[in-house]
Design a protein with these regions (language model features):
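Exposed beta-strand/loop interface patches that mediate assembly or binding
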Residues: 1-100
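Extracellular beta-strand solenoids
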Residues: 99, 106-108
């Protein structure tokens, strides 16, 4: 079974269910039904943010939002070979966990 991977934008969010609707501008602004986000963390992407979505190829609308890819508009706040960083807020650096291989930083 082949999957269909698309790039779209979050059009609305059901915060209680952890699901979102995604709009595909290249498909005449077609909007999905509510689909889940692939995550066991609760951090919903902002409405209007770009996301990758996998749809099953069985002819249904079944799919899952994989997450937000890095892009020219959504760049990593910092980088490094052994860096782990998890931003907890919508604005990078406001609240985060950071580990660079030797130092653990927790900012809140």
């Amino acid at each position: 079974m082949n999957a269909n991977i698309r790039l779209g934008k979050i059009s609305s969010i059901d915060y209680a269910k952890g699901m979102a609707r995604v709009v595909y501008h290249e498909k005449d602004d077609d909007v999905t039904r509510l689909i889940p986000l692939l995550s066991h963390e609760y951090k919903m992407p902002p409405v209007g943010s770009q996301v990758l979505v996998v749809h099953l190829s069985n002819g249904t609308e079944a799919g899952v939002v994989l997450g937000r890819p890095w892009s020219e508009k959504n760049v990593p706040p910092e980088s490094g070979a052994s860096l782990y960083r998890k931003d907890l807020g919508q604005n990078p650096g406001d609240a985060m966990i950071r580990y660079d291989g030797s130092t653990l930083t927790i900012k809140c």
